[in-house]
Amino acid sequence: MRVDYDVAAALRHEGLKPDDYDEICRRLQRAPNRVELGMFGVMWSEHCCYRNSRPLLSSFPTTGHRILVGPGENAGVVDLGDGQSLAFKIESHNHPSALEPFQGAATGVGGILRDIFTMGARPIALLNALRFGPLEDERNVGLIEGVVEGIAHYGNCVGVPTVGGEVAFDSSYSGNPLVNAMALGLMETDEIVCSGAHGVGYPVVYVGSTTGRDGMGGASFASAELTKASLDDRPAVQVGDPFLEKGLIEACLEAFKSGDVVAAQDMGAAGLTCSCSEMAAKGGLGIELDLDRVPARELGMTPYEFLLSESQERMLFVVKPGQEQSLMERFIRWGLQAAIVGCVLEKKVVRVLQKGEVVAEVPANALADDTPIDRHELVSDPPLEIQAKWDWQEDLLPVVGLKGINLNSQSHFGSNLSWDEILLKLLDDPTIASKRWVFRQYDHQVQANTVSAPGVSDAAVVRLRPQQGEGSVDEVNRGVAAVVDCPNRWVFLDPERGAIAAVAEAARNLSCVGAEPLAVTDNLNFPSPETPTGYWQLALACRGLSKACKSLSTPVTGGNVSLYNETRLADGEIQPIHPTPVVGMVGLVHDLANVCGQAWLEPGDLIWLLGVPIDTTVAVDPRVSLAGSSYLECIHGLVTGRPPEIDLKLECLVQSFLRNSITEGFVRSAHDLSDGGLAVAVAECCIAGNLGAHLELPSSDARLDRLLFAEGGSRILVSVPSTQAVAWQKVLNQAKTASPGAVFDQYLGVVTADEELLITQAGNRLVQLPLNQLRECFEQAIPRRMGLDLSSSV
């Protein structure tokens, strides 16, 4: 069959390969027309079909006693007990945010919210994981300003609190920022709304906003590297309306309660093409779509434009016959569009009509189920660049002493730095520093269920308030905790260890607030998998995620894969991002009265380190290291070394012990040791509680910078009331008796009323800093770099 278009040019435009075209022709038993080729282009993109990553994802654990819905639906669902379930998912909007930071981020929030309420859940919380280049670059300042404003605008207007997240900075993200949005929704019904169509002849109803030309080919755009040309591709960025989405949420939840909707699918990536093909394929049926009935906001739209538009705030339903009129009236009352646009077919195809003619007909499973898989060879050895970094040893660093470190003459800090100066420089690192400038723009109290606000604890906590209006806030004692984590520098240096650390830290953060970790949603942000290094990073990170999720009993319920996160520079060089597998994890708080924050609460409280203890010998513990640490990068300008091993058995033991200790009332505060190690964690607890601390480090032959700033897993700082000292020691002894050989506690010091942080060893002062100086560095690091008024930014 001859075609009326330039095949080679069309394939380039759609991001398809010649082999893909041959396969399409084989499946159709003919050549596709231009509309059909566009449908295949978006549906066979990595963004929609995971053609490079699907075999790797199959290794993830996806089942568990609390899992109600796993991968494959709009969102995962876990059973919370007491008749409540939680829907949750994370998605990326990276490439659109690089082009139009405000709209890219805003529509990312809108899209993840639709994934949640499409399941029949009411959205109760948002989180985000963001990555940018250094703030010394004005373009990066513009990106973070636009992204944060977009997230705040959409979330605040739609009435869903943004309760937590993380922000990190690295030069690898300068041309390709990462914007990952996570949402949680509460369900109080056994009726989960799924997306598979059923009921031959049942009407297909379109609801929400009109269809325009915005977001054309967004899925294909998201599956390619960013270039100078693509940065001018503004039509690939959608435009959102949070007020319309608010009405869509309420109308959809009303419709789902009626029982008249038998299947639902939001229109996200690939728009109508994806919605129709996924609903048809999952239901084992077909869908006929009449474009003349689709509400349009622009005249003269072609079938290609209708099918590939990614206009926001749109949904597709399969509805029980006879109920379509009442359902559409409900949406119209909310000021939304509603129209019958097709029907369910027995033949397993997506058939598209315009002006009474068939403009496209494609087998549904060819678009949404039986899609291509690109196989890549996994190299047996790490790339040479990484092998060289793994050879680095701590003894290559300059000599340290009680007063600090003797730097070489090439250091931009001068020849010497005291431990005080080093701690202040770490607190001034934007990745470590306070993110108050970011989260103060978010409404985190809307819905009045936020128990633990951003910056207060290691994870966000939201009250599980009944959605039916039964019971006051005071009567609700259960909550859900959520967190997003990824140590991207570790993943860059060792993808498997870094991914394990991401899962372990997420679970650790949940445990620090007293929550039982339940399940994971992941967002795999990686460069191109078509290079040996790129695929090695992706494959080993997936291996690490799988291993950690199995060990910590946190199944994966779904997520998102975002590849080709790299920028082609003006000289033609490719700049890939650091591989960033963001782990979103949710946990159950059985009693909100026991929620734990990171702030010191009372002078005199005892400070203990749980988990891997501080070294007392020169021998290097592989579980704690300066390799890949914030200290190494910030002070020495090095991103090198092999990150520490995570002892998953100890991780489970320590986290379980911590949760039990919080429940029993022993632990007043808890904070995990992460970026910057012990010294930074203690400083953060002091700043949060406006109280000082005196720590006496054990005598040790190990380097002092290792004792103060080394990083690793299974390390949690807790404070315990002095009145509980004897009982606490008894509990510790019982735990160690139950786990012979486990050493996971170390007394370090005491919380003080003095507004200073004092760290000593054998009576020698290492660190002595007033709280106001710690706080100033911590709070002003980001605003200062952005040139903001510091007096109004803290």
From Swiss-Prot:
Quaternary structure annotation from Swiss-Prot or TrEMBL: Monomer. Part of the FGAM synthase complex composed of 1 PurL, 1 PurQ and 2 PurS subunits.
Organism: Prochlorococcus marinus (strain MIT 9303)
Keyword line: ATP-binding, Cytoplasm, Ligase, Magnesium, Metal-binding, Nucleotide-binding, Purine biosynthesis
Subcellular location: Cytoplasm
InterPro entries, alphabetized: PRibForGlyAmidine_synth_PurL, PurL_linker, PurM-like_C_dom, PurM-like_C_sf, PurM-like_N, PurM-like_N_sf
Residues reported to bind ATP: Y50, K89, D522, G559
Gene Ontology CC entries for this record: cytoplasm
Main location: cytoplasm
Similarity comment: Belongs to the FGAMS family.
Presence of the UniProt keyword Transcription in the record: no
Binding-site residues, Mg(2+) 1: E91, N560
Name under which the protein is recorded: Phosphoribosylformylglycinamidine synthase subunit PurL
Residues the record marks as active site: H47, H93
